[in-house]
Amino acid sequence: IQVSNLTFAYEGSHENIFENVSFQIDTNWRLGFVGRNGRGKTTFLNLLLGKYDYQGSISASVAFSYFPYSVEDKSILAIDAVEAMYPDYEYWKIQREMANLHLDDGVLYRPYDTLSNGEQTKLQLAVLFSKENNFLLIDEPTNHLDIRGRELVSRYLRTKKGFILVSHDRAFLDGCVDHILSINKSDIQVCKGNFSTWMENKQRQDAFEQAENEKRKREISRLEETAREKAGWSDTADRRKLRSGPLEVDNVK
């Protein structure tokens, strides 16, 4: 996936969310996507999905799918919801993925709205990961999972390849990603490693930048003090000249 000179701002806004962003990611990577709330994580996922116009280019050799999928009519059978998510699904692949998520395939023949939130999460992940040549954009999958469910889904994702994961659960991210996408102001950076590795690098970088900033402040203070001293010396010299009075010159006759 190649992103080149991506620039985007919402219509009517004079401030760019992204500005000249360029990076490349491998479609086999498991990427965690981090950044402060409101910095543009969901916006970027929507750009990958082609929902907004933008400047620059995004090229990919894979199709993108978004989690969570919005099932409009939740009264339908779960198997019909599967077909809505993936019309070309293969039943045995769905069963395989469901088994890996410890989800009994009997849920497929229940009304979708009778599934617990955790079962719905697992079913959707099973369907989306059964797709071929597909890259998942996974947005907060742990919202409706208990601790055991989170551990199970984390182990499941660790066996997969090709996704971007947004999650506020740091332990969850640590357990299943091998790269980090991070939003820094209007730019996006790619780092190898899990969330803890990225955080350690970020803290070192922040400490270095803070030290450099303090160093610059001290240098500015030193230069200002030197300038004040020189100005003081100049004022003292001028006052001495004034106290000594004008030089008398004898008339030469």
Residue ranges and their predicted role:
Residues 1-10, 207-253:
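Flexible nucleotide-interacting loop at or near the entrance of a catalytic core
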Residues 1-214:
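ABC ATP-binding cassette signature C-motif
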